[in-house]
Regions:
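N-terminal Rossmann-fold NAD(P) dinucleotide-binding loop
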Residues: 202-203
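Residue-level marker of beta-strand positions
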Residues: 27-28, 88, 108, 122, ...
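C-terminal hydrophobic helical "lid"/dimerization subdomain
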Residues: 2-24, 261-262, 284-285, 328-385
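NAD(P)H dinucleotide-binding glycine-rich loop of Rossmann-like/cofactor-binding domains
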Residues: 117-196, 245
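Glycine-rich phosphate-binding loop and adjacent beta-alpha segment
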Residues: 214, 237-244, 277-342, 379-385
């Protein structure tokens, strides 16, 4: 396949797809290989076999969208050409391609953005999040969801309960990341936990850890406004503002004091640390914070190489340093959490922008000084087909 060839999530080259005339334009937000953003009208295609055509109603802006824009890559994932951004999405089915039996026009769905090959040993083993041939929306060369019309395999579209909004449906993707991390970490009822980072992922992790029964529960961040928001989201949590003048080990000692380790001993230290920043100093702090035999789950995406991890401490204390890549089999459970009232994440959406101002949404998300939590791009137009 040449670099100029773009494949859609069902493996069909765009050049072989059937264009579809629509009554409204299809504005999209694209990132370029030279680190620019552009808003242009994108083509619309009829759904192929097994696909549905969606009207994307809400897309959340993720930190990875900012990385692709500013840095042009995340690890080995490189922006080599124009690509529509966005992967945290919900929408409504407009058309169904042949062979689709699980959805019909009018169904409201959350969009699971990764489409694995379904044939490798990892897919056959149920670990499709590790598929090397996954086609992930918003990761070059696969167009994402910051557009009005998008085709997607019906298999990876999940019906929304009637009481779950499109905005909440667009939170399913980051919630899925957290759910996979919590399950892999083995978070236990009544055991202490620390969440490092009060950004969108960290705040969702805080709410999910509380719903999972973790206690005591502490969240850390450099930004006091985010910690204030965390206390409103989960009033029973404690907060710790990271001290820039202290090193990672010293900050960890201060965090452990909140668990009353001096009185309870090492047993009282947090059993699980959910590291949601990907920042090296925060990962190191998490390693020193977890109790001996505990787990540090790195959920945040950080640098390709970290050279300063406390290897000997991790070894002698038998700290389980774990990692996740996206998620698997989390979307149905996530919908149950939202529809069943187990989690209420609506307050995380701090800013919304219409689709035509999607570029403003990314600028807002990239500027930490404005206090944004989760920025979403919405499209409320009707009669789109």
């Amino acid at each position: 396949m040449s670099p100029a060839t773009v494949i859609t999530p069902n493996g069909v080259e765009k050049s072989k797809r059937t264009p579809l005339a629509t009554p409204l334009p299809n504005p999209s937000l694209q990132v370029t290989a030279d680190h620019k953003l552009k808003q242009i009208e994108a083509p619309v295609y009829a759904p192929s076999h097994g696909e549905v055509l969606l009207h994307i109603k809400a897309t959340g802006v993720c930190g990875s969208d900012i990385h692709f824009w500013k840095a042009g890559r995340i690890g080995s994932l490189v922006v080599e050409g124009d690509c529509i951004l966005g992967h945290e999405a919900a929408g409504i089915v407009l058309q169904c391609g042949s062979g689709v039996t699980n959805l019909k026009p009018g169904d409201r769905v959350a969009v699971e953005p990764g489409v694995p090959c379904g044939q490798c040993f990892l897919c056959l083993d149920g670990r499709y999040n590790l598929c090397e041939d996954v086609q992930f929306a918003g990761v070059y060369p696969y167009d994402g969801t910051i557009q009005r019309y998008k085709t997607h395999p019906a298999k990876w579209c999940h019906k929304l309960p009637d009481n779950v909004t499109y905005s909440e449906g667009a939170l399913l993707e980051p919630l899925s990341v957290v759910m996979h991390g919590i399950k892999t970490a083995g978070l236990s009822l009544g055991r202490g936990a620390v969440v490092c980072g009060a950004g969108p992922i960290g705040l969702i992790a805080l709410a999910a850890a509380r719903a999972s029964g973790a206690h005591p529960l502490i969240i850390t961040d450099l930004e006091p406004r985010r910690l204030e928001f965390a206390r409103k989201l989960v009033p029973t949590c404690q907060t710790y503002q990271v001290d820039r003048d202290l090193d990672a080990e010293a900050n960890a000692k201060q965090i452990r004091k909140l668990f009353d380790v001096e009185a309870a001993g090492e047993y009282g230290a947090p059993d699980v640390v959910l590291e949601c920043t990907g920042v090296e100093s925060s990962v190191i702090t998490g390693c020193y914070t977890a109790r001996r035999g505990g787990t540090v789950m790195v959920i945040g995406v950080g640098r390709e190489i970290m050279n300063n991890l406390p290897f000997m401490h991790l070894s002698l204390a038998e700290i389980n340093l774990k990692f996740i890549n996206r998620y698997r089999d989390t979307w149905p459970a996530g919908l149950q959490c939202l529809g069943g009232g187990i989690l209420d994440l609506k307050s995380l959406v701090s800013h919304t922008y219409p689709l035509e101002k999607a570029m403003d949404a990314l600028h807002t998300c990239s500027d930490l000084s404005n206090g944004s939590i989760k920025v979403q791009i919405i499209d409320e137009v009707d009669d789109v087909l």
